[in-house]
Amino acid sequence: MKAGIHPDYKKVVFMDTNTGFKFLSGSTKGSSETVEWEDGNTYPLLKVEISSDSHPFYTGRQKFATADGRVDRFNKKYGIK
């Protein structure tokens, strides 16, 4: 790797603004806000709107839309089961 062209990779805390869930991960993104983590160290705080704690796919609250096909519409129209 060339020196001086890559961004600094450091540990940051991501916080889900909907649920307040926090997790520690690595990122090149920085922030002026900081938070003290469970290990006693202070890390930059990055706020996110959606994480695995609030996304419907991961929480099991996902809704599936079923679209009726042509055969289903025909059967419904003519009362065929």
UniProtKB/Swiss-Prot annotation:
Q: How does it assemble?
A: Part of the 50S ribosomal subunit.
What's a Pfam family in this record?
Answer: Ribosomal_L31
UniProt-listed NCBIfam families: L31, PRK01678.1
What SUPFAM superfamilies does the record tag this protein with? Answer: L28p-like
Intrachain disulfide bonds: none
Keywords, ordered alphabetically? Ribonucleoprotein, Ribosomal protein
Q: Which family does it belong to?
A: Belongs to the bacterial ribosomal protein bL31 family. Type B subfamily.
Domain of life from the UniProt record: Bacteria
* One GO cellular component term: ribonucleoprotein complex
Q: What is this protein called?
A: Large ribosomal subunit protein bL31B
* GO MF term list: structural constituent of ribosome
**Organism placement in taxonomy:** Bacteria, Bacillati, Bacillota, Bacilli, Bacillales
One of the protein's GO biological processes: translation
